[in-house]
Amino acid sequence: MSRLLILAPLAAALIAAPAAGAPAPARFGDADYARRSWDDTAVLCAPDQRKATRASSIGCYSGYSAPRYDAFERRSFYVPVRDGTRLAVDVYRPLANGKPAEGRLPVVFNYSRYWRATELPDGSTETYVGAMKPGQTQSLIDEALARGRGGEDRQGVGLLLQHGYIFVRAEARGAGASFGVRNGDLSGREAQDGRDIIDWINRQPWASGKVAMIGGSYEGMSQHLVASAAPKGLVAIFPMVATFDEYRASWSGSGILRKYGLAWLAREARRDGVQSGISGSTINPADTSRTMVARVDADVDGRQREAARQERRSDPDAVNPMSYFTRQSPAAGELVRLIGHALGTHEPAPIIEVLYSTPALNALMEKAPGLREKLTALRFARDDAPMTLQAQNIGANNLAMLAPRISASGVAVYNWGGWRDFATLDTLLWDANHRGPKKLTMGPWTHGPNEPDDLREVAAAELRRIEQLRWVDYWLKGVPNGVLQEPAVNYAVLTERDGFYWRTAPAWPPQGFTPRRWALGPAQVLGGAGAADRTASFTADYNSSLGEHTRYHDAIGLGPTALPDLDAHARTGLSWTSQAVGAGFEMTGSPIVNLQLTSSTPDADIHATLEKIDPAGVVTYLSDGELRASHRKQGPAPYRNLGLPFSDSRRAALAATPPLDAKHPQHLVFDLSPTSTRLRSGDRLRLVLTAANAHTTLTIPQAPATQFTVHLSRSWLSLPVRSSMR
């Protein structure tokens, strides 16, 4: 709580009168993210709302839903699904006078491959509602939260219990204490299991028959997954920071393999008890926490939990965390096979270490004849695996292919994303592709959120709790709180350091923004007149990196974010810096890079980073993106794509794309992560091009290093801008 109070003087988020033609803003008062108690729901209330009998707007909720309960009971069971596999399920029920609340209550459900609760070394259990003492099944909400990490209701479940909701949390098959083996993450079978659990919920005497789902990251993705199975009674979902197109966001949508996800695969294998990690590793460290997944109530001696682990150890796919990595593409399987052969091992742990470390991979290629050429020739195509092209009823899914089913289910969706999340675009694509009731909030936060002493992260936890409650009150209890009568979109505009303010729009993208072109000019100047027949060159630095704690690493548990010296990073490639901005403006949407270039190698990776430099010389990262030249052919997206560039990336397109050479310039176009940022008078923009982001994407150093030449007259940066209204 003290951390929040320290931040209170920083919080101010008043909306100024909009310019003509701009969307009318929602009501925003002076933001007070330093709540006085965990159940405070007046974070963004305007002064008159604080005095009113009832109030309902983003971050402001009172008088519509009365808090009635101050305690809860947690019980844990095994629930069999249709094929008899037993899944571990926790049920949290509000208590009145020490007894579960009478009558049938609406249920909020959370479901994923993550642990539903954790047994700590002292015998206590960490839950979504704080911590419970050894053997304890009932607790005051206040006391459980106070015993938990941070003493806060970060998941908002305490608030839901207080307002008369039952909370159910389940572990997917093959994870945690659940039995069974996995058919890949986000599988069709996992969707059916989720449907079976909802059917079980609705058969219970305490359930009203109306269910909503909440959660972020995988827990957000699993909401879309379960909704695609159209379970009876699932009315609304609240998915946060959920990826949409796995190939594009997490796999290889630009042709460049994302390797940071190896840390996530390795971590989950350790938690599932099928791998042990490596001491001293940054990507796959040994687990020294001495924690375990919580047992169900009847499993007094832990034998059932251990039996579930033994079952998954018998499955080759479960034992090897690389399975999800390789099933998406034969080329990925060949990548792993080639590196394993060069190392003389089939064990996943050392292969992961080499894949993650560009120097280690380069050293291995120097020792293994022909390895560099074989790895360079690999292409990661969109149509290499069925999951990237169509819905899978059994195996792993690319959720974008399920969007039509989700819309057809009729479920209401509140998409919740952050401008500093790794999957920012995905949240916007979920909104664009849903054809049912929907709402969208894009905040200033990361994937976690877990940045210490950062107002933007505090806002994420505070606002999420309130918006969850407003959403489920409307859909599960029929409370007429107006959540669908407000503007459909809330979005934060980032300012200086951890500052931001809020805007609204009737739909995404907001109106009034027009593309502004910034030429890549001579003398590394961004903007101004184009440079006819001029070029700029640089040599690939394969160690160029935004570090090991980027927005991407934060998404897999390697946060908080911490970027390196961005001026030093700019010197590892080629950069263009604008003149100081005269009149301020807002930039909201996806920056787009257009390049005309030649290369000394037939294929090459291009990474772009967009930054803001204030009058004092402080550099702020805004966005980044990348493209492998062999994936430059554009094609139709299989979903609504917000008018952005879309790399075809299918095998036929790759085969039809000519290689790069040093004489014939080729056109590359790609988008960077969307953002919403205000630039003030005196600020400058900088665009940085490099040949690698060595700790985030697979980097295969070439010998000699690639030489790039950018043809300036046909190269530019396009930004969606409008005049600042603050």
Which residues fall in each region the model found?
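N-terminal cap/lid segment of alpha/beta-hydrolase-fold proteins
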Residues: S57-G103, V581-A583
